[in-house]
Amino acid sequence: MKSKRQTLVILSPGFPKDKADTACLPPQQIFVKALKEICPGLNIIVLAFQYPFFAAEYDWHGIKVISIGGNGRGRIYRLVTWIKAWLILKRLLKERRLIGLLSFWFGECAFVGSRFAKKHHLAHYSWLLGQDARKRNKYFKWIKPKGDELIALSDFVAREVQKNYGVKPLQVIPVGIDISLFKTTSAKRDIDILGAGALIPLKQYDLFIEAIAYLKEDFPNINAVICGKGPEMQSLKLLARAKGVEDNITFKGEVQHKEVLKLMQRSKVFLHPSGYEGFGAVISEALYSGAQVVSFCKPMDKEYRHHFVVKTQGEMNARLLSLLKNRKLDHDPVLICSIEQIAKNMISLFVD
């Protein structure tokens, strides 16, 4: 006999293929695990549309994952993926007691999820996580959502959605961090500047390299580290060589999440040069690691200690120089929000 426990289905473009796949969407991984921990009696099922690149059903930390294996293919293949997702949801509706659907990002998952939920009178929320709030997101035209169906990752994302689409998300639920992942350490802060993220044009790591070149004039032995992979890797390495800082910057490539956190705890400053960011989980993680944070993005209206928001490259360089010259930098952890509280806020939308 099939379980009739309350079931929440999470729809996501991707999800880790196994427990070792910690580099795949770390904030979403942490969130789903937290949901399981605070609601042990709740049955959670994750339906992954595109990644992993294979079709399977498997267990991930006690959570059932159903991978469709869409593999990012477009046109007719994407339609086939949507049909498969719909059929899986129909099966789950028959077998389980669904309390609702939660879609990560306002994209194809939200499209399928919203239509299915309306047809079967289920609660459905779309969690806008950043890029989906920008202009020219076709899914807003297709879905025509109401504000009470939308959850914004940050105050910034909520404003972007209202500005670009004339609808204001009624809920703002930001990134949370799992403080248990941060080990007590007395490690020396031997990394001057750390960066972590996808090496794509939007993240602007060319500005990171130019900042290191600027700082090298005052700190010839400056030690910088960049974690992440992407199509910009080779061009960034060439830029570092051209700027004379190839010996000052270590390109780590893709690094497991727990190792990134360890590097943060060894860093004096975390530099996040991204030109657009819904929130940036790395900002929360770096702050809790005790690093000073410099970024162009300001996700929440509230001010947080150790987070310096700059508007120009010149202002960024000046702030970095000031921080590195300060021999009495405060490296106390700053907590924006715990993942437990975020999970409680989310599940309260589905259950009383």
Q: Can you name each region flagged by the protein language model?
A:
Residues 1-53, 351:
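N-terminal subdomain of nucleotide-sugar transferases
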Residues 9-11, 186-203, 207-212, 225:
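Conserved donor-binding/catalytic core segment of Leloir-type glycosyltransferases
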Residues 124-151:
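A conserved, positively charged/aromatic
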Residues 156, 176:
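Carbohydrate-associated surface elements
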Residues 237-255:
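Nucleotide-activated donor-binding/catalytic signature segment of Leloir-type glycosyltransferases, i.e.
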Residues 254-255, 262-267:
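Short alpha-helical donor nucleotide-sugar binding micro-motif in glycosyltransferases
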Residues 275:
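Aromatic "clamp/platform" in nucleotide-sugar-dependent glycosyltransferases that forms part
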Residues 325-352:
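A charged, aromatic-enriched C-terminal amphipathic alpha-helix characteristic of glycosyltransferases
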